[in-house]
Amino acid sequence: RMMAQMLNECYLAMGFKSRFITCMPKVMINDCHVINAVYSNTLNKWLWMDPTFNAYVTDEKGNLLGIGEVRERLRNNQPVVLNEDANWNNKNKQTKEYYLDYYMAKNLYYVTCPLQSEYNAETNYPGKKWPMYISLVPEGYSSNGKPGATAYDSHNDSYFWQSPYQE
């Protein structure tokens, strides 16, 4: 979580629209994974960036993919390609089969993030309100929110992944 929050704040400091995304399994058994979505003005979409695994994902033609696109491609058994130098904390090289097909497929049942991407989003100090969250969940599923936080669920991929420049 910390690495994704730090990368998010680096992206924000450089002027990029970014947010950290908590990727959740259907049943939480002490495991989830937090990655980043950074908005590309050139590609007009959010891109997958994972600081823990030094990972990004492309399609079979080398086009960068976003979290929603990877999720959909895994669901539909379409090709996804993990960058060749992906590794866990600069120690263990990762394979597409483990990282995407097993680990992330399990953790992409639903995704959640703060409504506002900002510095110190989850830093707790006197007088600071805990952020509101939005989750992209499958039909018929409820994220149940984060304890002590206001949370909203959406089933609409287009809404969740819309451009940060939309009015």
Identify the meaning behind each predicted range.
Residues R1-V34:
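Active-site neighborhood of thiol-dependent amide/isopeptide-bond enzymes
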